[in-house]
Amino acid sequence: MSPQVRWKVCWENELELSDHTELADFFRKTYGPTGAYNALPFEGARSWSGARPELRVIGYDAHGVAAHMGLLRRFVRVGEVDLLVCELGLWGVRPDLEGYGINSMRIVYPVLQQLGVRFAFGGVRQALRNLVLRLCRNGLATVLEGVRVRSTLADVYLNLPPTRCENVILVVFPIGCSMSDWPSGTLIERNGPEL
């Protein structure tokens, strides 16, 4: 039986310190099993990894945070085209709830329409390919492979270049337009840190 999840949409400025602390704990427990390094950004009460979200969609159940997705409007460059998008990041479902079909996209999609963007996108690691394909089977999104995303690092380090380029699986959600309106190009310039 699917657990009862209640969803909350909130702007970043609406979060209290206790919210950040609870979310940081959620991310450590959700991302930690995928590799200790993945949980490092969420030390203390830090509830973001790179860029901070503008909006958050948070699912709660009787045990606390059950699921999360962060949203951030930004301009990216796809090939030669500048495009206002909503980046989706900080996706997560608490490990004990995986496989129950908890999906925030039915909550996120109307929010994306209100934000006035034509596309939402998120980049995920190759290891999550099957999960993303399941997420997109309802036809709301298209999976693009062979796309590189160049981002700035969240912090500047003397021993590292200021940008990195990653081969990711890109999930693109057309919002009130057609997927054919997505510009062609195999490089996306994020011009900022990933969400």
Swiss-Prot record:
Any single Gene Ontology cellular-component annotation: cell envelope
The keyword Metal-binding appears for this protein: no
Pfam annotation, one family: NodA
InterPro entries the record matches: NodA (IPR003484), Nodulation_prot_NodA_CS (IPR020567)
GO molecular function: acyltransferase activity
E.C. no: 2.3.1.-
Keywords: Acyltransferase, Cytoplasm, Nodulation, Plasmid, Transferase
Top enzyme class: transferase
Primary location group: cytoplasm
Subcellular location: Cytoplasm; Cell envelope
Superkingdom of the organism of origin: Bacteria
HAMAP family: NodA
Protein function: N-acyltransferase required for nodulation. Acts in the production of a small, heat-stable compound (Nod) that stimulates mitosis in various plant protoplasts.
NCBIfam families xref list: nodulat_NodA (TIGR04245), PRK00756.1 (NF001974)
Family the entry assigns: Belongs to the NodA family.
Protein name per the record: Nodulation protein A
Organism field: Rhizobium etli (strain ATCC 51251 / DSM 11541 / JCM 21823 / NBRC 15573 / CFN 42)
